[in-house]
Amino acid sequence: MAARGGGAGGAGSGSGPSAGTAGEAAEPALRPGEVAALHPQEVAARLQRMRRELSNRRKILVKNLPQDSSSQEVHELLQDYELKYCYVDRNKRTAFVTLLNGEQAQSAIQRFHQFSFRGRELTVQLQPTDALLCITNLPISFTLEEFEELVRAYGNIERCFLVYSEVTGHSKGYGFVEYMKKDFAAKARLELLGRQMGASALFAQWMDVNLLASELIHSKCLCIDKLPSDYSDSEELLQLFSGIHKPVFCQLAQDEGSHGGGFAVVEYSTAEHAEEVQQVADGITIKGSQVQLSFCAPGAPGRSTLAVLIAAQRAMHSNQKGLLPEPNPVQIMKSLNNPAMLQVLLQPQLCGRAMKPVLGVAPSLSHLLSPSLPSAILHFSKAQQSSAVGNTSSLILQNLSPLPLIQQQLMKFDNAHTNNKPGLLGEPPAMVLQPALAIGPPLPLKTDLGHHGEAHKTSNLIPPQTTLAAGLGMLPFFSNQLPAGQAGPGRGTTQEKQSASVSISEASFSGSQHYLQTFPGLPAGGPLTGNQKTPQSQPKGTEVASKNQTSLLGEPPKEIRLSKNPYLNLASVLPSVCLSTAGKGMPPKTGIASNILDAISQGSESQHALEKCIAYSPSIEDYAQASSLRNEKRGSSYLISAPEGGPVELAGQHPQDTGVSYTETYLKKKRVY
């Protein structure tokens, strides 16, 4: 074996002051891992301090006390000693006493054990402790003050000491610490296990307090660490460590049938033999690796010590990772198939509000169109390119083209669950939901709606249709819609009169078109122009599907035409449109938007009233929670009430146009919700 030259053992063989002086003078020339020889007086002082702390058990138990014993009686019994703590448990008839030091504890045991107290024979003994730890793999140069500072960081300690060699007086690389509470000891064990200290990692394990005896604290086992990872020759290892003394146990660490431990345990018959081998063989080279020999915790045989070290190494590896594995990018992308996540991502698209956006895109747009989400995914993709996931996951994250499939999957999810559970007002059929979740070219919005429907006069906030179609195509649309501002056929002078107000009306209804796209009487095939033909109210299949819905409040009167939008009660927004009298005895009109545009073109007061009407229009969620009975009462009140006269008159309208009259009646009323 190749041994280190000038080891600590050789340095310690010298005697007298000259040896200590020579050791101190040679200290700068010492190689790494070597320590200077100590003066014999220093060696004696260290050993004396170690033995004093070893026997410094100052907590005692006084058992078999009378049932009515008090703490005052225990103080009087032990009046010759300095008590630091005293507690009497009357149920157990036991007193827990802490004295000044271990010497007083030993004296009290010898004096009061089997002492007769009020007719009872007392039993006095040392308190057992379950907060004792042994810390191994400490640096040889670690001082007692450094060790105390290390362990005191985790709680109040009862005592701590290092184990020194009886020959050289140097530390053996392990020590003991007893905490006041077991919680402190458990925390220290968890934190110190695997902590790097110098060139090695610390080990912390529980110890039996009965092993704290001068003849038992010196270990007989050595840990051979930093072996080659592929080293598996136990016979060669046994031969290497049998040159000075033959070991009684030598085995490589085998974890679950593999030689992946990288260390071994060797046990000798005496602690002196183990110390001699450690001084000579520490730092030898095996298969090109310089191994490290350190003392194991004393008390246990070599086989048990090996099992404890394997378990400790497994615990160190498990502490470096979380309880759950980290998800890879592929799993993150697959999570988008979850319907709950789709609902969150598409929530602004399904229930957009006419509110001024604070950050990101307009509230009528989906979160998937927000630049923050794609940029975050791309940033995360770049961070994961060097991981073990591979190039496939990076390409998946960088390619956002599959994202349009999210809305299609959401539609399938909604259609699969349609009409499963009838609500208070019945569930809308799938034919009604499809227009609300239409996938197609986006609506070219002109303005951005502010708070309460205020129109901010900005143009072309949304890119052209081709751009948004490439950007997932998530917006609702009108089928075959003409570009905004383009006149329909037959407008003539009416179009010229309304040219000043069309831009305002477009701004006011840009956010409302999302909600009015399924209103009856609204032209579905063209823009909001005057002479468009009113299409049929509703296909027969939709009416049949609507009649099949069950409602706890029964069917509404036939005179009231309800909206086909499942989330919006039209009677609360524009009640005159729902009345059958609005369409009786007159030729077909141009629809809701045309009537409102005509009203706007007549004057600023009507325009102000219209803006108030739109401003008081709540969002979809508010109407989804409103009571249907309350809405029916409102509809019946509109049926009975007649149009009220007022200062606002509609110029250029026919007297028989009762639909416009009902619209003006509603615009004048101030509703309080």
UniProtKB/Swiss-Prot annotation:
GO terms for molecular function: RNA binding. GO terms for cellular component: cytoplasm; nucleus. Residues 58-129, 131-209, 220-298 form the RRM domain. CDD domains: RRM1_RAVER2, RRM2_RAVER2, RRM3_RAVER2. Gene3D superfamilies: 3.30.70.330. Pfam families: RRM_1. InterPro entries: Nucleotide-bd_a/b_plait_sf, RAVER2_RRM1, RAVER2_RRM2, RAVER2_RRM3, RBD_domain_sf, RRM_dom. Residues 1-34, 481-549 are annotated as: Disordered. Its main location: nucleus. Residues 18-29, 499-512 have a biased composition (Low complexity). Expressed throughout embryogenesis. Detected at low levels in adult lung, brain and kidney, but not in the other tissues tested. This is Ribonucleoprotein PTB-binding 2. It comes from Mus musculus. The lineage of its organism: Eukaryota, Metazoa, Chordata, Craniata, Vertebrata. The gene is Raver2.
